[in-house]
Amino acid sequence: MLNNLRARLLSLKFRAIRRAVIILIAKIPKDLERAITFGDALNHFLMISPFRPLFKFSVPKNIKVNVHDLTFDSPIISASFKDDVSSLFQWQLIGIGGITYKTVLKMPSKGNLRPRIQEVSHDGNYAILNSLGLPTKGVMKFLPQINNKKLTKFNRPIGISIGGNSFEEYLSVFSEIDHHLNTIDFSQFFYEINISCPNTDDGKCLSDDLESLKNLIIKFRDISSRMIVVKVSPDITNEEVLKVCEILSNLSKTAINIGNTKYVKASDVGLSQKTFSKEGGGLSGKSLYANTLRMVKLVASNYDLPIIATGGVSSYDNVKELLDNGASLTGMATLLVSDPFQIPLINYRLSNE
């Protein structure tokens, strides 16, 4: 009960401080990324300060989830949108079951021009629209970060999201990372293949060519025995998602992540060219949940395949409903940046079902 009270108090303080930071830093000119940068710096300070024990919550032992050869301490994992160690460390400290690094490309990229991430309202719900465009330090600068002891000491699965602008780039990045993983002791890694990103310039996705996707995953499986997750877009059709599942079901140690952010025009959520550099971007938030649940039911009723349900998951009720309908894990993004201290509260309720 004391842990619950502490989580609730931290939740209130976090939301108040976050709102104050956004008002003071991100409103004029409107650019949420400035508040995010400030928040990341503040979080880094807290994670190396004497206050760090305040953020530590034990995870109930009876909510572990086994997916292939990996054991997740909680069915809640982070979606692939961050790679700074302090954030990933904090989320594990508060009780997340596993983490996923944001998408890695072969070469460094600054992504799209700012402003490229904003708070919006969609269908009456809080949401975030981003057109980051996959900013990345590149695979060679990413490799030394992988075996960070602050993250591996939790002994929870760590996902690595892999992207590419071509078949060859996906294969090159995967090969470089897998070769590096074979040189380190920590073994709880898995791969997430990002075949759909709604805010890149050419708009092309590997999901548009399922034969190439099949050939790519076969090559991945020839290289590595680690679990391979394919992340699909919420805009994918029923027929397409079932075809992806068919490919995965014929290979060992695979899973599907449903799904990514949803493409929305900036003007449809009240943003102008001054407040958003691209015509549209990827929407995350509560309004995605109904479609996430629908897709989980579709996949679970047709294939015996581990499912990670990502998109609009924002409460215990969401997590419970997804798990009850066939999801193995639930991925979170917006909740982790808006109120991460809901995680220990959700874990507690899951343990007392």
Identify the residue ranges that each predicted region occupies:
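Alpha-helix-loop-beta-strand connector modules within alpha/beta enzyme cores
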Residues: 122, 127, 137-156, 210-230, ...
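Alpha/beta catalytic cores of nucleotide-metabolism and tRNA/nucleoside-modifying enzymes
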Residues: 1-56, 283-304, 308, 314-353
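Glycine-rich phosphate-binding active-site loops on the catalytic face of alpha/beta enzymes
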Residues: 95-107, 190, 195-197, 255-262, ...
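Glycine/Thr-rich beta-alpha phosphate-binding loop at enzyme active sites
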Residues: 47-57, 195-208, 241-301, 305, ...
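Catalytic cores of alpha/beta
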Residues: 85-91, 172-176, 236-250, 300-303, ...
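N-terminal capping/small domains of soluble enzymes
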Residues: 2-155, 346
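Active-site beta->alpha loop and helix N-cap motifs at the rims of alpha/beta catalytic domains
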Residues: 117, 121, 125-192, 197-204
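C-terminal helical cap(s) of enzyme catalytic domains, especially alpha/beta-barrels
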Residues: 111-125, 265-281, 323, 329, ...
